[in-house]
């Protein structure tokens, strides 16, 4: 088995990233993205100067992460947000996620972020333990995700 290496994604990685995004969505109980949506979002992110999509290769793409460094008024500083980190199920516990997070941390530091924010589902004990093993600390913040359709926002008067 090849030792994985991390590199910045290209548009040619869209299919592999889509497969990983589907795996993540299914694990979270979300609707999986379409290949076209992943391709379009990947193209957008690749154009963003303070956003990165990373892939881990080792006998194909075995993991991916995305991050962006953004100004954050709540923290008064730049924050690196990691909206996605996923490793193929059969390649977990082989150091792939750690390699991706090492590159995330390098890019965050290189771009003057003072904090890395990421989330893990409360029921995802494996992910929570992984992040703790890297030195991340769970906060007392409890987050609920609220969603609404932009084209057809929810009516606040409806139950």
Question: Each PLM stretch: what is its role?
Answer:
Residues 5-19:
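A short beta-loop-alpha structural element at the N-terminal edge
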Residues 55, 60-69, 81, 86:
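Conserved beta-strand in the GNAT
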Residues 87, 93-106, 129-133:
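Conserved acetyl-CoA-binding loop-helix of GNAT-fold acetyltransferases
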Residues 98, 114, 122-140:
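Conserved active-site alpha-helix within GNAT-family acetyltransferase domains
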């Amino acid at each position: 088995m090849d030792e994985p290496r991390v590199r910045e994604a290209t548009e040619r990685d869209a299919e592999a990233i889509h497969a990983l995004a589907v795996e993540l969505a299914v694990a979270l109980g979300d609707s999986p993205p379409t290949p076209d949506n992943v391709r379009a979002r990947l193209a957008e992110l690749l154009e963003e100067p303070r956003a990165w999509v990373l892939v881990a290769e080792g006998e194909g793409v075995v993991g991916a992460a995305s991050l962006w460094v953004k100004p954050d008024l709540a923290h008064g500083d730049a924050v690196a947000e990691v909206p996605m980190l996923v490793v193929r199920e059969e390649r977990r516990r082989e150091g792939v996620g750690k390699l991706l997070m090492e590159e995330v941390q390098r890019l965050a530091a290189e771009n003057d972020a003072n904090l890395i924010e990421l989330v893990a589902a409360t029921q995802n004990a494996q992910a929570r333990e992984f992040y703790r093993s890297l030195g991340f600390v769970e906060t007392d913040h409890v987050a609920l995700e609220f969603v609404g359709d932009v084209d057809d926002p929810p009516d606040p008067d409806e139950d």
